[in-house]
A protein has these predicted regions:
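Alpha-helical structural signal in soluble globular domains
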Residues: 110, 114, 174, 178, ...
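Conserved N-terminal segment of class I S-adenosyl-L-methionine
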Residues: 1-159, 169-172, 239-243, 248-256, ...
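A short His-aromatic
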Residues: 160, 164
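Substrate-binding/catalytic lobe of Class I Rossmann-like enzymes that use SAM or dcSAM, i.e.
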Residues: 221-249
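Short, glycine-/aromatic-enriched active-site segment of Class I SAM-dependent methyltransferases
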Residues: 188-217, 222-227, 243
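Short N-terminal helix/helix-N-cap motif within the alpha/beta-hydrolase-1
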Residues: 166-170, 197
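A short glycine-rich, Lys/Arg-flanked "PGG" loop and its adjoining helix->strand segment in the class I
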Residues: 169-184
Length: 288
């Protein structure tokens, strides 16, 4: 039984049996811990703290984007959708896709606009209702509770979901069940092995539960590969991108500008070496 002080996560979410060890990185919730086998980093947040920060997502006004921010988001979505179609070797109209943890359904909307047969699943009731109010086919609840048929989707997406999960393996196992043989699972999350994380340490915004509610589990390319294998997926590729060293709001203008120039110069090396702070894992359900 968890006490208020007991960490919500007590074992490696990837499935390793190695004892977790404290690191030197101290967050508001306590020291980050590391799995000695896969390098996964884990928050020391209690269940109460986790639930407190997760509450921000169940708000009908959450995650509204407009203007240039929405334009950039749509461009990213179109690029990802084009790659999904390319990996599947199908036209969008022949692809059934589900965005799991879809929030307001922005990616669902982008997929529908591109001709995909797209829908979403979102556990937060208010935000799921906001998506439906916008005319999007979004179900409320967990993927595991939807009772989808076996092998019914060509592609699934999990954008900024796995870092919230104490035990992600059941979700990935369900993803494998509902995907068709050869289907694609696309996962996005932060990269705890990035140059950004190494440089910023405890200042990395991805570690900040007050800013990014419920972030308790921090992946790296190796731990993502192990999780994928444990769930029965084949890794097509793992991409990382972007470097940053400072937060704009907490850094003097001159220092921020210099750091941004250096970060931009390192974007390509970070991408090539797997050290960018955004991670995108392209997984495939085996054809047999």
């Amino acid at each position: 039984m968890n006490t208020p002080e007991t960490p919500y996560v007590t074992t490696c979410p990837v499935g390793c049996t190695t004892t977790l060890a404290d690191t030197a990185l101290r967050l508001r919730e306590g020291l980050l811990r590391r799995c000695g086998s896969c390098g996964q980093l884990l928050s020391s947040a209690s269940a109460a703290r986790y639930n407190e920060t997760m509450a921000q997502f169940d708000d009908s006004a959450f995650n509204i984007t407009t203007g240039s921010a929405q334009t950039r988001r749509d461009a990213v979505a179109r690029k990802r959708l084009a790659r999904i179609a390319g990996l599947l070797g199908k036209l969008p109209r022949d692809i059934r896709l589900c965005d799991v943890g879809c929030s307001r359904g922005q990616f669902v909307a982008a997929a529908v606009a591109e001709g995909f047969g797209a829908e979403g699943v979102e556990p937060a009731p208010q935000i799921a209702q906001a998506a439906r109010d916008a005319g999007l086919p979004v179900r409320t609840g967990l993927l595991e509770d939807q009772q989808y048929a076996d092998s019914c989707f060509d592609a699934l997406t999990l954008f900024e979901v796995v870092e919230h999960l104490r035990t992600p393996l059941p979700l990935l196992t369900e993803c494998r069940r509902v995907l068709k043989p050869g289907g694609i699972l696309l996962i996005s999350t932060g990269n705890a092995a990035s140059w950004t994380a190494a440089t910023m340490g405890a200042r990395w915004d991805y570690f900040d539960m007050a800013r990014d509610g419920g972030h308790i589990s921090f992946f790296n390319p190796r731990s993502m590969e192990i999780l994928a294998a444990n769930a029965g997926f084949v890794v097509e590729r793992i991409d990382t991108s972007r470097v940053k060293f400072h937060d704009r709001e907490n850094t003097p203008r001159g220092r921020y500008a210099a750091g941004k120039l250096l970060a931009e110069a390192l974007n390509l090396p970070a991408r090539l070496l797997g050290r960018g702070h955004d991670m995108l894992a392209w997984l495939r359900k085996p054809a047999q």
